[in-house]
A protein has these predicted regions:
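Positively charged n-region of N-terminal signal peptides that target proteins for export
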Residues: 1-4
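Bacterial N-terminal signal peptides
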Residues: 7-15
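Sec/Tat signal peptide C-region and signal peptidase I cleavage site
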Residues: 16-22
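Short, extreme N-terminal segment that most often corresponds to the first beta-strand
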Residues: 23-31, 106-107, 136-143
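N-terminal secretory signal peptides
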Residues: 23-81
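Short, ordered beta-strand-loop transition motifs
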Residues: 53-59, 95-101, 127-135
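Long, charged/polar, surface-exposed segments that mediate recognition or autoinhibition
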Residues: 65-121
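C-terminal partner/receptor-binding element of secreted or periplasmic proteins
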Residues: 116-143
Length: 143
């Protein structure tokens, strides 16, 4: 999983969207949704490209924000959105074991400690994972 987020970070860092207005994704990152609902809602609002830019062996699909979309999570800038739902045609399947039946999240610019502090203060049960210095994943999963 660390390899995935690092790859996403490097690939998308140069493709940051042009700012128009910020859309906060704090509520869905309280981990009360399915991977399908999270990704479908963002795609329907045209905030992410509905086709994944990358699929990891654990079936996590990475989606890019659309041009002009300024997505935030707990005050941190989002540069990648990830998700997966088992047996859902919206997602492509990797060649390994899926991470979970349903999973979703975002990759943000921010230190692990600051992101963890913001998530804890908000009462979210999301998992925080350091990808690289100042690049952190916020992740929700259901088995």
């Amino acid at each position: 999983m660390k390899r995935f987020f690092f790859t996403v970070a490097l690939a998308l860092a140069a493709a940051l969207p042009v700012t128009s207005h910020a859309v906060a994704l704090d509520a869905p990152l309280a981990c009360t949704e399915s991977g399908h609902q999270f990704i479908a809602d963002l795609a329907q609002q045209q905030l992410i490209d509905p086709k994944p830019t990358r699929v990891e062996s654990n079936s996590i699909n990475a989606f890019s924000p659309t041009s002009g979309a300024d997505l935030t999570a707990y005050g941190f800038h989002i540069f990648a959105v990830v998700g997966y739902e088992k047996d859902d045609p919206m997602f492509r399947v990797g060649d390994g074991e899926p991470l979970a039946r349903s999973a979703y999240g975002v990759v943000v610019f921010g230190s692990e400690s600051k992101v963890q502090g913001a998530i804890t203060a908000a009462g979210s049960t999301a998992i925080v994972h350091r990808v690289a210095p100042l690049i952190t994943a916020i992740f929700c999963k259901r088995n």
